[in-house]
């Protein structure tokens, strides 16, 4: 069975890793002002965010993919794959994961996993799924392994300033 591994771009995996492990990212939307919608890693970068904050003193706003957008994303993947496993960043922090889950509930062979993590912790769960998919493991084996790995991850970070946190 050919399994696609999908995730939101906030997993912070490099393009090189995504290409090597066949990981399909959703570029998460964010706005730098009222009329400046961008997509993470596609039309906007971390550098853009820092420059915007320095220039305006304002933080960017983010939005979640809706169910329709996830359905479109999953259907596109199902054209080339037998199943899709989508990993989202913590469902407690964003509606993104809930929207992906609701979209998957109306589809066959689409599964969602709550990484219960952010950033690199989230990325580790995604990477483990991709490695196991390349090893030829089943959907059930990949999900079970991802949940075991997820429950062992603890992510910490230090910041130079609280300016970008809210």
Language model regions located:
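N-terminal glycine-rich anion-binding loop in soluble enzyme alpha/beta folds
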Residues: 4-64
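Short, well-structured alpha-helical segments in soluble
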Residues: 72-80
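Short glycine-rich or small-residue beta-strand-to-loop segments that form or flank ligand, phosphate
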Residues: 83-90, 111-114, 128
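Short Gly/Thr/Asp-enriched flexible loops that form oxyanion-binding sites at enzyme active sites
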Residues: 89-107, 124-127
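Long, charge-dense
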Residues: 113-125
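Short, small-residue alpha-helix embedded
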Residues: 122-134
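Internal, active-site/partner-interface "lid" segment
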Residues: 132-166
């Amino acid at each position: 069975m050919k399994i696609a591994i999908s995730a939101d771009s906030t997993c912070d995996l490099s393009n090189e890793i995504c290409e090597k492990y066949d990981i399909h990212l959703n570029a998460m939307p964010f706005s730098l002002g009222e009329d400046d919608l961008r997509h993470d890693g596609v039309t906007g970068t971390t550098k853009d965010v820092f420059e915007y904050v320095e220039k305006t003193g304002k933080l960017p706003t983010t939005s979640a993919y809706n169910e329709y957008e996830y359905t479109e994303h999953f259907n596109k993947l199902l054209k080339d794959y037998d199943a899709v496993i989508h990993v989202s960043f913590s469902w407690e922090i964003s509606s993104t994961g809930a929207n992906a889950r609701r979209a998957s509930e109306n589809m066959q062979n689409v599964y969602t996993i709550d990484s219960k993590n952010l950033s690199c912790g989230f990325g580790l769960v995604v990477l483990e799924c991709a490695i196991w998919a390349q090893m030829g493991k089943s959907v059930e084996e990949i999900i079970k392994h991802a949940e075991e790995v997820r429950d062992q991850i603890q992510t910490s970070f230090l910041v130079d300033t609280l300016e970008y946190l809210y």
